[in-house]
Amino acid sequence: MAKTKQRTQVGKHTIELTNLEKVLWPDDGFVKAELIQYYLTIAPTILAHIKGRPLSFVRFPDGIDGESFFQKNRPRYCPDWIDHEKLGDEAAEGKRIDYLLAADEASMVWFANHACIELHHIHARRPHFDKPDYVVFDLDPPEGYPFPDVVALSFELKEYLEGHGYHCFVKTTGRKGVHVVVPLEPRYGFDEVFDMAKTLAQPFVRSRKTTTTLEIRKDKRPDKVLIDVYRNRPSQTIVAPYSVRGS
């Protein structure tokens, strides 16, 4: 079967869309055209959260039942009008990552057309790439842990953090976990923000020893929810609000 192609105008940019009838979710019958339509529709909302942030993608070129891969670097075939930024050690050019950034509806459509189902972003945005503008507490439960209990725990953590004067938001990850996010002014480096997160989390975990832990190794926390503060390290990402998930 010949591959279908279609040109469309999104804002100032002409984008060639391909394989619009490719089934990405076999069990539900959702095709790539519907993924593109979703990201175009949600663009004004999601861009408020991710515009100016370096992005990583989980791509599913053959649908969610096929192989997937995590992409950080800007591909060679990316059009010049897609915003991008090189980050990393300037003394080690080979180790720097050329991240893509979402700037408008057209970039969202281009990402979706390349089966970028999941969007993940770092914790800083232009121009303060070295200074996070939020701290995240990632609640990661073990397999089979009741999701309502994770939600309840996240609101306990929110209340605890608010007791320390922070304004917090709770968001789902689209899978089994929950994020508690605390907005920050971009004034502090990643190390300072990580230390802050760990310092705040330690008393919370000590008061809930039977249900929570800061232990990162899964074999040492079989029945406990990890309060993952290590997500606040440089180059770590979290899934974007309103991102589709592959599973």
Where would I find each of the regions flagged by the language model?
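An acidic- and aromatic-residue-enriched active-site/binding cleft used to recognize and process polar
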Residues: 20-22, 60-62, 140-142, 171-176, ...
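Structured core elements
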Residues: 16, 56, 136-138, 169, ...
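Short beta-strand
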Residues: 58-60, 168-174, 215-219
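Broad gene-expression machinery/nucleic-acid interaction feature
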Residues: 5, 12, 114-116, 134-136, ...
